[in-house]
Amino acid sequence: MLLFLLSAVYPVRSANLFFSPRVPHAGSLIDVEARPGPQPPCEKEPVPAYPQLGEPALVQSWSKSDLGRDWKPPTCTGWTEEGFSTLVTIAARFPYTSEAEGLLRHIGAISQLAGIRYWSTTHKQWRTLIMNAYALTDSKPAQHREDFTPNEMKEGKVLYFEQFDKLTGKATYRMHIVEASASRLVFEVENVSTMRYYFLPILHPGELQSMYFLDRESDKVWRYYSIVRTGKNANGLIAGNDSSSVNRAVAFYRSLVGIPTTQEPPGR
């Protein structure tokens, strides 16, 4: 489990829409200058840049009209397929005073994903996103095991877990620990089984990809950056649902940094 809780309130700020904490379902448009494509904090400065500690997380849903249909993922992600159906980034700073091992322990606590809630734009209410989640001994979903420990999450390690999602049912995921040091954690997650909605395939293996970058800034502050992509061949049932993608990404961000997942305002 995560070893800390944030004492302050950190709502989510969209790059294109700002939600007032007092009126969580109302928004006001603000002008935003044209931005380059997303850039994780590797090789170059991150885009979008990190907000200051205490400011809302910066959440951005990127459009094909801005980036083009053949958008190429940043090289450091290792993703090779061009284009996307949905693309969401989150940049934030958060307070954390323990060592990186505590974050690794939380990341490896797969069973703790159960119960994560998100804002459903369809039902206009908070709903449970993850019903159950289990660490696996390998890519076979029948082999449940205890949560992963920090000692197992070494750089280069590949781990598997199973997740029962409210929206897409049961699926198996691969988690690759890209970097693991005292000051930087990088890991990527992608589905290795087909994801279905009422038995209808909506995402084939490798079509839901996410990458997370956690960097220590000081003894009390860490930086968070995530990029989540659904492939351009995703089923039309989810291909155009940007709000759902945003709210799912926000739910995982909040869970990781210790913010209650139902804290107002919702992501979008």
PLM regions: where:
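Structured segments of extracytoplasmic/periplasmic soluble domains
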Residues: 110-113, 217, 255, 259
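Hydrophobic ligand-binding cavity/cleft-lining segments
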Residues: 17-167
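Sec/Tat signal peptide C-region and signal peptidase I cleavage site
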Residues: 10-14
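A mature extracytoplasmic/lumenal domain signature
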Residues: 165, 179-181, 189-193, 218, ...
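A conserved amphipathic terminal alpha-helix motif
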Residues: 234-268
